[in-house]
Amino acid sequence: FDPARPTCSGGTFVFHNECVGDRTGHRESRFFDTLENQIRKNGDTGRRLIIKMDIEGAEWDSLLGASDELLASIPQITMEMHGFDGPKILEVIRKLKRTFYLVNLHFNNWSCTSGAAPLPAWAYQTHWVNKRIGVIDPAAPVPAPMSPLNAPDSPTRPDCQLRTSRPEH
């Protein structure tokens, strides 16, 4: 948890020195609140929000604690997910897939390890688009070609993206 307060030139930035989790309360030395409560406290209930989340493993509990109604109201979620074998991971992925399409998956090459198999890394950036606004293109290649935005997180470390075999012609 990094409580540094970045500046936002020309914008309004309100920083809350708290963590997101599945319930409200203190744990160890930190205060946690739910995603829904944080949205409400910011005055954003009912507004179209794009959620950007990188909370070092707490995403699993916070998303399990989020109601289906809250998730249905969010058009897009961009987040780094952490872990590969925790019991909550499959439950969260299934929950997200009820409402969202996973449209981008990029493995953080700072976390590449064979120990995360079958995944190539234990940290991965994802982008989820709500099914009520996303439209699947049946003619698009699966997986989609890698975007230049998915450059390696570390330019000096080997990359470890999933590779799919291409049919030979």
Question: What feature does the model see in each segment?
Answer:
Residues 1-169:
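Phosphate/nucleotide-binding beta-alpha loop and adjacent structural elements of enzyme active sites
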